[in-house]
Amino acid sequence: MKTTQKTLLAAAVAALAAPGTWAQTGPVPTQTLRQTTVTGSTIDDRFGDSTREPTSTVSLSGREIEAQHADNLVQVLKAIPGVTIDTQGGDDLKIKFRGVENQRYMGEKPGVAIVIDGVPVFERTGKVNINLDNIESIKVIKGGASYLFGEDALAGAVIITTKRGATNKGVSVETDVGAYGYQRELARIGRASDNWSGHLQLSQRKADDYHFQSNYKSQALAGNLRWLLNGHSDLTLGLEKEDRFRDKHGTVTGVTQAALDPRGTLGRDYARHFDVDLERVNLTYSNDLSDRTNLLALAYQYRDHTQFWSAPQRFSSTGAPVSSPDAYTTFNDYHQTQRGVKSELRTTTGPMAWMGGVEFKRNEYLNKTHAMVGYRNSPSPMERPTAAGTVFTDDRTGENEQALYGEGQWRLATDWTLTGNLRHDRIELDYDAKPVSGNRNSAIAERKSFDANSARLGLSWSGLANTVLFGNISTGFRAPTVDQLYRGSQSPSGSVANNPDLKTEQAINFEVGMRKTFTLMDREASLQTAVFQIDRKDFILDTNGQYSNGNAAHVARYENIGGARSRGLELALQSSISPAWSWDLAYTYLDSTFTQYDQFLLAQGNPRGTLVGTGACAGPNPNWNNCYQLV
């Protein structure tokens, strides 16, 4: 079956790549190939051209977004097939494409890169906070996109351009109200002249929400200033500062709870009371060195300071039961700083064009957790209580990333364009933890590096009026996290060991599709459809299984357990029935499954050896590290 699928895909791409199959009989007229330009960029979306793009893409303008009066990004992206979103209240969400990571719902990365004004933004939990009031445009790229955006673009990327330019001049005041106490206010002032344009914007959103304890509020200050240095170069400064608060997740789990407890008043979320402070500053330089050559450069800094509660308290320090919805044991304090510079040079030479880029990133993550109250994990008098103020974690993770990437486009014939991309990433991790209670007062210092290559080869044909046929093969990758590599050192009292030998996850995407615009009932309409398959290998998962607990008899660790596959069909149709009314239809057929799943916890024993007691089980909390060894 696997060979047949690849053969059919190769035949489809070969058919698209054969101009002779579309040619008329008789003499072939002389054709002059039009000049082509590279469309790919990790810095600026200005070079996009849907007639030559060999990948499924969807673009939304700021005008389209504002016309929806959406209160979160879910309502904006719901018309795009293949997109699923985990919402956590307000604008805090996790975006997923084509079934990749749909089976996960906690703190894992989503396999989708999020880029705002060229700045790659992400949170440790895989979620992203997006200011809906500061969006000029959104571009969605589906399929492996690491060839441009690097790590974790297994299934695609979302590129957001914030508001800028002379269109924001003047004074604007807006307000919206809605159900469950939803309110939105916005005030903006802008100026523009021949040499510069700029604006400042203050916005606020808040709501009580339908679900219990799911109120949220966000306040944001955003601005953009653009200088025209001369007739062919400009400098753009973008900034955004946002304060967010969100209480519970604003969801219920399963059909039973939805029927019996639709507002989620029973039980307690594992984490709540999120305070998030975000800051983003980016400076972009653009220079048209000639009518065929452009230089782009970007420097940026992105900060995320998040504090929240976790682990509901079950028993007091004396062992008495605790059921208050506000009783939690752990305070989490997380600082994230991302800094980077990158530059791209692109040029055109008739029917050929290319772009070369270089990127340097330095990310730092500081994580500290401590006990908010004194507590016990059980009512047993033998259970040693945890004192208020006990420090569980105090660590730092550093990431150094360097990348070289490029794109080439060749106009093979009048209507045929071949696109190729290559990227190489070098990722260096350094992890340091102070000696605290959570790691049994042992200092930790670990170093690890990974190298990864990504590519895309695509073909597009625009020989029919208002129609583009396209096909591509692209790849994506994800590097192991510090938590997966060194879980045993982070939590030696647990049952998960270190595995510093993990390999990067890989994904390969196959896709064939069509874009078309036409007239439907005297109205302009657009259609896009694609068939796709994403094959993943070296999938990383805890050998205990997903969200399951281990024990001393089974020494678990994260492994490259096997592979997964997502395949399907996407169709999007959009049109209008009047100037004031529009409609859209989005359909997705998706089949996702594990193609290989190496099960380590077999009934006949541990595959790595036999666990033998060491007799060194001292202390109140014995664990596999000091109680057992493999022989």
Predicted regions and their residues:
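Gram-negative outer-membrane beta-barrel transporters
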Residues: 353, 411-418, 426, 526-535, ...
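Membrane-embedded beta-barrel scaffold of Gram-negative outer-membrane proteins
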Residues: 294-312, 462, 468-474, 501-560, ...
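Extracytoplasmic beta-strand/coil segments of soluble accessory domains associated
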Residues: 74-119
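Transmembrane beta-barrel wall of Gram-negative outer-membrane proteins
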Residues: 177-206, 211-249, 271-294, 348-350, ...
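Short acidic/polar hinge/loop motifs at secondary-structure boundaries
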Residues: 112, 117-143, 223
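N-terminal periplasmic "start-of-domain" segments of outer-membrane beta-barrel proteins
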Residues: 34-68, 93-95, 112
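Structural signature of Gram-negative outer-membrane beta-barrels, strongest in the C-terminal barrel
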Residues: 351-355, 359-361, 395-534
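N-terminal periplasmic accessory domains that precede
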Residues: 73-76, 95-96, 112-115, 128, ...
